[in-house]
């Protein structure tokens, strides 16, 4: 696998592939990779002739009092895992490469509406940071296809909306959440959990599963939400949000809506975990 921190190197290699009529898939990451990321890379390899990955801990998407400095950097292990999964080109830029004028002077991309609810309400500016860096990476790599995990459901919708609104010629593919045997969604932030917290953490998935089951049995949105919040608190979580939304727009769900998604974020110990469940009522 070729690794470079330089934009020109990435463009030169992609251009060489394009000259042969070959296709390119892209998997952007922040590193500290787990099996969910590796699944994205393997899926990417099945879609296109070549796979490009990136590792960049993006300062623009971290808010005040968030874990930018604490975010684990594991480049050697990540490189090995990416190579084994089929990536051929790895972009590892520094903040100076991506934001040469600094964050204050950087042009940014903001997707209105869906960026400001749920995680966007809890983490102001987060999705502006996500949209900006992903747009920049898309312009550098210029892939045919880009893959993202469905675990970050709101992020996936933000990126799909940005691509559609800006007429970017890229197919965005969401890939199913990879879970541990307990049901806990794989996440780099699971590393912050103590053994006791990790044992309690599957309650997050259990709560949203119970909500969906209740809705399908005719229980009200309010009823299933209150029951789920109580179960999370009993398990040791502090819920940030737990909401039922329209699956395509993230508008507040109405009884007549068929396509629904339950989204939650909750704190346990030092970790803020997210999960979701997409279903039809």
Swiss-Prot record:
HAMAP family: PanC. Beta-alanine binds at residue 61. Gene3D superfamilies: HUPs (3.40.50.620), Pantoate-beta-alanine ligase, C-terminal domain (3.30.1300.10). This is Pantothenate synthetase. Pfam families: Pantoate_ligase (PF02569). It is an enzyme of class 6 (ligase). It is found in: Cytoplasm. Its EC number is 6.3.2.1. ATP binds at residues 30-37, 149-152, 178, 186-189. The active site is at 37 (proton donor). (R)-pantoate binds at residues 61, 155. One of its GO terms (cellular component) is cytosol. It comes from Shewanella baltica (strain OS155 / ATCC BAA-1091). The gene is panC. It catalyses: (R)-pantoate + beta-alanine + ATP = (R)-pantothenate + AMP + diphosphate + H(+). GO terms for biological process: pantothenate biosynthetic process. Catalyzes the condensation of pantoate with beta-alanine in an ATP-dependent reaction via a pantoyl-adenylate intermediate.
């Amino acid at each position: 696998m070729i690794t470079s921190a330089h934009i020109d190197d990435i463009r030169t290699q992609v251009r060489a592939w394009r000259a042969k009529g070959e296709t390119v898939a892209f998997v952007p990451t922040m590193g500290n990779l787990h099996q969910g990321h590796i699944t994205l890379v393997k899926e990417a390899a099945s879609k296109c002739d070549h796979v490009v990955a990136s590792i960049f801990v993006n300062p623009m998407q971290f808010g005040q009092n968030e874990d930018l400095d604490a975010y684990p950097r594991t480049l050697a292990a990540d490189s090995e895992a990416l190579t084994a999964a089929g990536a051929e080109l790895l972009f590892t830029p520094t903040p100076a490469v991506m934001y040469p004028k600094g964050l204050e002077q950087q042009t940014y991309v903001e997707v209105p509406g869906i960026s400001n609810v749920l995680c966007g309400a809890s983490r102001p500016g987060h999705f502006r940071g996500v949209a900006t860096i992903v747009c920049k990476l898309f312009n550098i790599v210029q892939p045919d296809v880009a893959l993202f995990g469905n675990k970050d459901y709101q992020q996936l919708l933000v990126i799909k909306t940005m691509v559609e609104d800006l007429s970017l010629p890229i197919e965005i593919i969401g890939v199913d959440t990879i879970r541990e045997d307990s049901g806990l969604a794989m996440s780099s932030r699971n590393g912050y959990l103590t053994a006791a917290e990790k044992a309690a953490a599957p309650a997050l998935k259990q709560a949203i599963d119970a909500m969906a089951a209740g809705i399908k049995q005719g229980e009200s949105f309010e009823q299933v939400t209150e029951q789920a919040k109580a179960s999370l608190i009993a398990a040791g979580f502090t819920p940030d949000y737990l909401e039922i939304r329209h699956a395509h727009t993230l508008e507040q769900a109405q009884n007549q809506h068929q396509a629904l998604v339950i989204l939650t974020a909750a704190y346990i110990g030092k970790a803020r975990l997210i999960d979701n469940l997409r279903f039809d009522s």
